[in-house]
Amino acid sequence: MKFFIDTANLDEIKEAHSLGILDGVTTNPSLIAKEGIANREDFIRHIKTICELIQAPVSAEAVSTDAEKMIVEARSLAAIDPHVVVKIPMTIDGLKAVRQLSEEGIKTNVTLVFSPLQALMAAKAGATYISPFVGRLDDISADGMNLVEEILEIFSNYLFETEIIVASVRNPLHVLAAAKLGADIATIPFKVIDQLAHHPLTDLGVERFLKDWEKVEKQRV
């Protein structure tokens, strides 16, 4: 399974990249705003910097809601760097845009997917990736990972090449469940990536080894 990081923070991206586990980045308007980016020029520069850092897929979102405007915006985003993947919302206009962009060879990530039928429509329209939001479904007492399982079954039935990005990941259990189901990708906040690497027994083991080694060193003196 591939790991993307869900952030626009350069320090977080650099740190995750240094671990040797990073396969891509996803951003959204909220994450961009969190970095204090206030104009189009700075946004373009920021996305280009991320692409140069990791040389891997970087999702940048089109904020238009009309299909024609989405297409124009997507072309502009795709021109930033060959690694840019354009995030398109799962709407009727979004599907129209995805179809056209697919024909032009522009990679797309259909976001805000909450049902298997939405995922099916996005795949048929030619989406490169689809992003089911598991955490938001869990928030309303639905089963986010069940959605992923249903999408995987449908895509397997019809051999769709569209990859599934498990999004809205809130904790390590979401990542574990995604991996067990066979999802292509999980896009993970930096905090959760950090949690994946830790276990209290590992920490205790390291501490014990160090204490035992100190005893050996003292005996040698």
Swiss-Prot record:
State the active site: 87
Q: Provide the catalytic activity annotation.
A: D-sedoheptulose 7-phosphate + D-glyceraldehyde 3-phosphate = D-erythrose 4-phosphate + beta-D-fructose 6-phosphate
Pfam families attached to this UniProt entry: TAL_FSA (PF00923)
Q: Point out the signal peptide segment.
A: none
The major lineage groups are: Bacteria, Pseudomonadati, Thermodesulfobacteriota, Syntrophobacteria, Syntrophobacterales
UniProt GO cellular component terms: cytoplasm
Task: State the family it belongs to.
Answer: Belongs to the transaldolase family. Type 3B subfamily.
First-level EC class:
transferase
Function text = Transaldolase is important for the balance of metabolites in the pentose-phosphate pathway.
GO BP, one example? carbohydrate metabolic process
Quote the protein name from its UniProt record: Probable transaldolase
Localized where?
A: Cytoplasm
Q: What is its EC number?
A: 2.2.1.2
Pathway listed for it?
Carbohydrate degradation; pentose phosphate pathway; D-glyceraldehyde 3-phosphate and beta-D-fructose 6-phosphate from D-ribose 5-phosphate and D-xylulose 5-phosphate (non-oxidative stage): step 2/3
List the coiled-coil residues: none
Q: Which PROSITE patterns match?
A: TRANSALDOLASE_1, TRANSALDOLASE_2
- Please tell me the species this chain comes from: Syntrophobacter fumaroxidans (strain DSM 10017 / MPOB)
- Keyword annotations from UniProtKB, A to Z: Cytoplasm, Pentose shunt, Schiff base, Transferase
